[in-house]
Regions:
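Alpha/beta-hydrolase
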Residues: 211-313
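Catalytic histidine-centered segment of alpha/beta-hydrolase-like enzymes
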Residues: 338-347
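Conserved hydrolase catalytic core segment
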Residues: 146-190
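Flexible "cap/lid" loop of the alpha/beta hydrolase fold
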Residues: 175-219
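An N-terminal hydrophobic leader/cap segment in hydrolases
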Residues: 30-59
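Conserved loop-alpha-helix segment in the C-terminal half of the alpha/beta-hydrolase fold
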Residues: 295-337
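Active-site loop/oxyanion-hole signature of alpha/beta-hydrolase fold enzymes
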Residues: 111-151
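Conserved HGGG/HGGXW glycine-rich cap/lid loop of the alpha/beta-hydrolase fold
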Residues: 65, 70-119
């Protein structure tokens, strides 16, 4: 299971993380880790990671990339399938803590590594959400899965909604965790000029944080150490899924901000307001119009809405309106005192709610 520390953001990263998703593996800046003990954890983690990867890792050639993913459950199960799309700065391991519990109720779980995440590489061109959805459909076709429950967190929620727009017959139901049910820029357009400028400034990171999470490391162990949470004495093998070699060095999240076009306040502003310099991929999340997409909704949709006084994207009212308008299909559940990441803040409640939803969805073999 992914340790809780993998979602515990330090204060200086708070606004940035919540703005573009969830920094799924952050660690404390304050504590110095005993290097000898940590080396033992690292060696053990490497063995665990390799074993886990061998058991659950799959890769399929699709139109644009070799699409990589983790899988749990019976690989012959083509009827009861949940496919999960992770949030920003995350990867397929995001859903690992819940997979086996859902296998127990008869589901096959597939968690995708999106472009430039985990073990899925970037396509050789400026690929959009549409291109990624085509690759995911290709994966489903290869696996002979005619339709599945599609779920996603934050950015992954928007990708899930986009997939439904493009390939509605492939979707038996949707789970949208704090993303994908309301247009991304909705909360920004509610702000006056001063408030908007202040919110955009929160994207800019201090230099020490920038170096720690988006810099280079001399070797894999140093990169592992940078994300290790000393308050949790486990091996934390999932950290290894975030480490990549680059130019004879090692990185963790380097390059991700630029890929989302959310490197700083200027890039964030360009993305929100549709600057033509923004890539097709980065602009994809802004262009999704959930209210329009769900006008003719005819499948069950579960909206999980994180709300708090510090909510970076307050859209409770919009979610409520959407659910009331399509009450036969859309269920809206709010989780209070959560800024964004429900599955971390309330893992048991999250599992309970989605389990109930999955048990209620009517799946066919057609």
């Amino acid at each position: 299971m992914v340790p809780k520390k993998c979602h515990k953001s330090i204060h200086v990263l708070f606004h940035f993380i919540l703005l573009i998703g969830c920094l799924s593996c952050t660690a404390s800046l304050a504590q110095e880790i005993d290097k000898t003990q940590l080396k033992l954890h690292y060696e053990s983690a490497t063995k665990q990671f390799n074993t886990y990867e061998q058991k659950h890792r799959r890769t399929t050639k699709t139109k644009n990339v070799n699409l990589s993913y983790l899988q749990w459950g019976d690989n012959q199960n083509k009827t009861k399938v949940l496919i999960w799309f992770h949030g920003s700065l995350s990867n397929a391991y995001e859903f690992a803590p819940f997979a086996l519990d859902l296998v127990k109720i008869g589901y096959r779980i597939i968690s995708i590594d999106q472009y430039n995440a985990g073990k899925t590489t970037l396509p050789p061109f400026d690929a959009s959400f549409d291109d990624l959805c085509i690759d995911i459909k290709s994966l489903m076709d290869t696996l002979q899965i005619q339709h599945a429950i599609i779920g996603g967190f934050s950015r992954g929620g928007y990708l899930a909604t986009n997939f439904y727009k493009l390939f509605p017959t492939y979707v038996a139901g949707l789970i949208l965790e704090d993303g994908g049910s309301v247009a991304f820029n909705t909360s920004y357009f509610k702000l006056n000029q001063r408030q908007l400028e202040q919110k955009l400034q929160e994207v800019n990171l201090p230099a020490d944080v920038e170096e720690k999470y988006f810099g280079f490391y001399n070797d894999q162990f140093a990169a592992y150490k940078s994300l290790y949470d000393d308050s949790n004495k486990s091996d934390q093998f999932e950290i290894l899924s975030f480490l990549k070699p680059l130019d004879q060095k090692w990185i963790t999240y380097r390059g991700q901000q630029e890929y989302y076009h959310m490197r700083d306040s200027l890039q964030m502003s360009e993305a929100i307001f549709g600057n033509p310099n923004v890539s097709k991929y980065a602009s994809s999340i802004i262009k999704i119009a959930p209210f329009e997409i769900f006008k003719q909704v005819d499948i069950p949709v579960l909206i999980l809405d994180a709300i708090s006084v510090h909510d970076p994207m307050p859209v409770y009212a919009e979610n409520k309106i959407l659910a009331e308008k399509h009450s036969n299909f859309i269920k809206h559940i709010a989780f209070e005192n959560v800024d964004h990441n429900i599955h971390f803040a309330y893992p048991e409640q999250f599992l309970k709610v989605i389990t109930k939803f999955l048990n209620e969805v009517k799946l066919t073999t057609d």
